[in-house]
């Protein structure tokens, strides 16, 4: 099997123009079962649940940060398939090494990014107008002290990584568009 050049990967990346700062999810998961386990946030008035879809090869407890991502200035959310493609790209080993290089720390997990969902449902008797579902990118962490300063520094590095990769995808598509225009004129 031949390796896919990174430029081709960036051309296929979804068009993500905005990555919001991290939101810490008030729950923990067992890494082995996090792919299909939904957790409910007991601190919320409404019923709020989190699905992180983490596929982790490391065992133990994980905690997560959620990043809302949008495709344009109108805050159009990407489709789940686009989010999966983006998570696959940022988890691609050469791309993930960039995050490790920025942090100066080796990650304990080969796939720290996944597609996540926050679902908020109004309490009984309330109107359905307050219900919402947000899909985005989740970064999970294995550190011993959830949401400590070190953990937040990792989430901040993950935010910068996501923003950098989304910018690289937009730049690759713009360059390809210019190449196509030049070929057509020639």
UniProtKB/Swiss-Prot annotation:
Changing residue 142 to Q: In strain: 17 syn+. It comes from the Viruses. GO terms for cellular component: host cell nuclear matrix; viral tegument. It is found in: Virion tegument; Host nucleus matrix. Keywords: Host nucleus, Virion, Virion tegument. The keyword Plastid does not apply. Signal peptide: none annotated. Its main location: virion. It holds the Pfam family Herpes_UL55. GO terms for biological process: viral life cycle. Belongs to the alphaherpesvirinae HHV-1 UL55 family. This is Tegument protein UL55.
